[in-house]
Amino acid sequence: MGIRTVEEYKQSLRDGRKVYISGEKVEDVTRHRVLGLTVDTIGAGYEMAATDDKAIRDLLVASHPETGEPINRFFVTPKSAEDLRNRTRLIHSLMRTTGGLPFGKDIGTDCLNAAMAVARQMGNKQYEDNAKNFLEHLRKNDLHTCGAITCVKGDRSREPSQQKHPDYYLHVVDKNKDGIVVKGAKIHITSAPAANEILVVPTRQMRENEADYAVSFAIPANTEGITFICRNGRGPWSDKEFHPDRPVRELTEAMIVFDNVLVPWDRVFMCGEWQHSMHLAYTFATFHRFTAISYKVPSVEVMAGCAVAMAKYNGLFKVGHIREKLADIAAYVETLRALANAAANDPVMFGDIAVPNPLIANMAKLHFASKYHDFVKLIQDIGGGILATAPDKKDWDNPDIHGYLEHYLGGAKEYSTMERLQMIHETMRHVCSHESAFHEVTTVHAEGSMAAQKMMILHESPLKKYEERAKVAAGILPWGSVK
């Protein structure tokens, strides 16, 4: 098949999967008020890949490295810095063209790329072949994948083997000739209810007595024993909103319950190799944080643009303290962009697989997460109190009060009141809404906590070299002894 149409993708989701949202069992995720938005957001990526626009199609569609047949570019295993740069360009283009993030293949391939790289380093040919064969399955059928990493964890102060319930961490409960049987739950899984395949990797390092928790595999979303319990979302645009002429773009997260799920042996990428569990989790995190910083650049560009526009609409663009805030906003965005580019340009090679530079990728994610709330505060400051108290579109459309709003809510004379209100509502969505509060939390915790990023930065940084150079400077070591 190679490249699917959006309708083929939607039809593939009508497969009997077990999905719940707000206590309701969903028979067809493609037609649900909230989950349908996730399907359409991902579907926008399929629409772009099937377009007649050659420039867009060339970005999304690549040639199979062996057969030359068309495949989605996300299914190109990165072998060079250029492959990583192409992945970033692809994510940027998808966001800027569709108005959202069609997270249909990004996280799943982060998992699979990590599984292939680690299987190779383990020297386990069976796992490596399983991963390669599964990649061919994805390429041939153009499937949407989600990555299931975070376990529910229970008491965070206790190891997996010390939990009150052993299935607070997903683990193997049985093995037979057909495969492994797993039990547990993964949580915060983006776009899970609209995925064709689920890729599972360990959430952390496991100990020798936790070998059953060191497990990685791929499984179809409609497999018996799998249940999705989804976060409710915002739903379509309402008549109260000033909104752009495009659909709402939103991705729904889910907790995935694995209740004694049978995974065939040929879909297993790790089973019991606890010594390598951290390596797999670590490698996935590097790939995924690179994906994260790639999609966050166009996201914060829009937010920065809101600040610039609001400064102009409010007549304050040339005021000194506003320009100082805009400089801080621009520095935040451009530092993130520079770090994202650097992570792609200086990869670490795992055999012939190019892994984004782990130190720089984690620095970039830490920069984004640790400074995001200050970034939001700057936009709120520039936008003004109107971000919290603005009238809605139904007020604007009411002829009894429209004149008052038109008259009193104008700003700088170069701009219409309508244009100012449109930008106010756009800015509200980013910094003063239920959606913005959601993103303030996910910025801290998605793709791993700031503590996890600091841990990886410390691990990757050449601390010994820093120390040796200081000793040379102090005369403790001879001059020229440290390269």
Protein language model features and the residues they cover:
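Extended amphipathic alpha-helical segments enriched in small hydrophobics
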Residues: 291-349
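Alpha-helix capping/hinge segments and adjacent helical runs
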Residues: 359, 363-483
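A structural signal for well-ordered alpha-helices, especially hydrophobic packing surfaces
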Residues: 43-46, 311, 333, 337-340, ...
